[in-house]
From Swiss-Prot:
GO cellular component terms listed in the entry, alphabetical order: endomembrane system; endoplasmic reticulum membrane; extracellular region; mitochondria-associated endoplasmic reticulum membrane contact site; mitochondrial membrane
Keywords from the UniProt entry: Disulfide bond, Electron transport, Endoplasmic reticulum, Isomerase, Lipoprotein, Membrane, Mitochondrion, Palmitate, Phosphoprotein, Redox-active center, Secreted, Signal, Transmembrane, Transmembrane helix, Transport
Compartments in which it is found: Endoplasmic reticulum membrane; Mitochondrion membrane; Secreted
Effect after changing residue 56 to S: Loss of reductase activity and ability to inhibit TMEM68/DIESL
Name of the protein this chain belongs to: Thioredoxin-related transmembrane protein 1
CDD domains noted in UniProt: PDI_a_TMX
Residues at the catalytic site: 56, 59
Lipid moiety-binding residues (S-palmitoyl cysteine): 205, 207
Gene Ontology biological-process annotations: negative regulation of platelet aggregation; negative regulation of triglyceride biosynthetic process; positive regulation of ERAD pathway; regulation of calcium ion transport; response to endoplasmic reticulum stress
Coiled-coil features, chain-numbered ranges: none
Annotated gene: TMX1
Domain Thioredoxin: 27-132
Lineage, uppermost ranks: Eukaryota, Metazoa, Chordata, Craniata, Vertebrata
Species of origin: Homo sapiens
Residues exposed to the Extracellular side: 27-180
């Protein structure tokens, strides 16, 4: 009897562990993990999403409350999810995550930022009492599905890719820091040149420029020459006529002076002796 009693306790502990293992596993699965591949599931239904980072102390303190809140998800008809921003940088840019942890409520594609107390009871009251209706939803311009936020997501993914390449150059290849920066500078330069050439090619295809043929020099025709020569001839004839009139007037004035000259001289000569006698 003693051996059977001594084996009963270990067997009971083993049964409890085996029975509790799937329970704990199912408990962890209540919180869904959101990635870049399945984030569009948030656009349908009722969701509460937590954005966190493993190194964040506030996020670590929130995890027990979030896990216990997830147990009520089925009763409240709300899906509980979380996003690790260190593994999903695109989603952090898409949702404009500037502080950690950040909690969003989503109802049929309308996103609202939760800014209340971070306890299990407050989360439950927020959903059951529909307190989210008093919060203004995020504008469609800044919604995660907008073109602007999609561009922001791509920018965040590009920055993380550049950081990964930088670490690879330094740690794996052994390049100095300035060598890694030089590689990125050259890559940026060549990519800019290639993008500029592509834009010029597309613009030329969409709006081709009209090629102008060189026009021959407009030589004046004979008619124009004859018509333009006629007023010149008239002007020359008028100038010649004026010159002739001037020359005739000058000639007449000279003749008049020549005729007066001998008469004056005769008078002076005739007056000369008489003046001499008067003086004597």
């Amino acid at each position: 009897m003693a051996p059977s009693g001594s084996l009963a306790v270990p067997l009971a502990v083993l049964v409890l562990l085996l029975w509790g293992a799937p329970w704990t596993h199912g408990r962890r699965s209540n919180v869904r993990v959101i990635t870049d591949e399945n984030w569009r599931e948030l656009l349908e239904g009722d969701w509460m999403i937590e954005f966190y980072a493993p190194w964040c102390p506030a996020c670590q303190n929130l995890q027990p409350e979030w896990e216990s809140f997830a147990e009520w998800g089925e009763d409240l008809e709300v899906n509980i999810a979380k996003v690790d921003v260190t593994e999903q940088p695109g989603l952090s840019g898409r949702f404009i995550i500037t502080a950690l942890p950040t909690i969003y409520h989503c109802k049929d594609g309308e996103f609202r930022r939760y800014q209340g107390p971070r306890t299990k009871k407050d989360f439950i009251n927020f959903i059951s009492d529909k307190e989210w209706k008093s919060i203004e939803p995020v504008s469609s311009w800044f919604g995660p599905g907008s073109v602007l936020m999609s561009s922001m997501s791509a920018l965040f993914q590009l920055s993380m890719w550049i950081r990964t390449c930088h670490n690879y150059f330094i740690e794996d290849l052994g390049l100095p820091v300035w060598g890694s920066y030089t590689v990125f500078a050259l890559a940026t330069l060549f990519s800019g040149l290639l993008l500029g050439l592509c834009m010029i090619f597309v613009a030329d295809c969409l709006c081709p420029s009209k090629r102008r043929r060189p026009q021959p020099y407009p030589y004046p025709s004979k008619k124009l020459l004859s018509e333009s020569a006629q007023p010149l001839k008239k002007v020359e004839e008028e100038q010649e006529a004026d010159e002739e009139d001037v020359s005739e007037e000058e000639a007449e004035s000279k003749e008049g002076t020549n005729k007066d000259f001998p008469q004056n001289a005769i008078r002076q000569r005739s007056l000369g002796p008489s003046l001499a006698t008067d003086k004597s």
